[in-house]
């Protein structure tokens, strides 16, 4: 499970998810990528579920790069607690993903295998995704 080793502040503001991703919009490490077409928070468990779905389908072939990291904490109050009396306890870790961001990359497999692996991974994620290829230099 991906979690930060240490953070400066345990509780963060939620922030806004406006616009497109500033960087990381091209395939840079592998041959094929999985790009987000909508914006959302992606939890560390969703990232891990997508990674497992891809690697199991590829059967130890190829290499996978995870280009997002859950560095933002999110909080929640316990069930049945009244409003007020401070911010809730940290509940988990998320990665804010804006549209256009390439989240995963694959190399060393055929295009058909990569497409199917990304299709399976896309079902585990809360964003709409599309398959992208590396631009020819």
Swiss-Prot record:
Has the keyword rRNA-binding been applied to this entry?
yes
- Per the record, the domain of life is Bacteria
Cellular component GO terms, alphabetically? cytosolic large ribosomal subunit
Q: Please indicate if the UniProt record lists Ribonucleoprotein as a keyword.
A: yes
The UniProt entry, under Pfam families, shows: Ribosomal_L16
Q: Name one GO biological process term.
A: translation
Listed NCBIfam families:
rplP_bact
The record describes the protein's role as: Binds 23S rRNA and is also seen to make contacts with the A and possibly P site tRNAs.
- Name the family: Belongs to the universal ribosomal protein uL16 family.
Q: This protein is called what?
A: Large ribosomal subunit protein uL16
Please tell me the species this chain comes from. Answer: Streptococcus uberis (strain ATCC BAA-854 / 0140J)
Taxonomy-wise, where does this protein's organism fall, top ranks first?
Answer: Bacteria, Bacillati, Bacillota, Bacilli, Lactobacillales
């Amino acid at each position: 499970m991906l979690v930060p080793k240490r953070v400066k502040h345990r509780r963060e503001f939620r922030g806004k998810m406006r616009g497109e991703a500033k960087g990381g919009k091209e395939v840079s490490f592998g041959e094929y990528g999985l790009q987000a077409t909508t914006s959302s928070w992606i939890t560390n468990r969703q990232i891990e579920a997508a990674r497992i779905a891809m690697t199991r389908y590829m059967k130890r072939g190829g290499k996978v790069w995870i280009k997002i990291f859950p560095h933002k904490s999110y909080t929640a109050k316990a069930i049945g607690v009244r409003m007020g009396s401070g911010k809730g306890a940290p509940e988990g870790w998320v990665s804010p993903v804006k549209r256009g961001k390439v989240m995963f990359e694959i190399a060393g497999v055929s295009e058909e295998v990569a497409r199917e692996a990304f299709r399976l991974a896309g079902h585990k994620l809360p964003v709409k995704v599309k398959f992208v290829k590396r631009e020819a230099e």
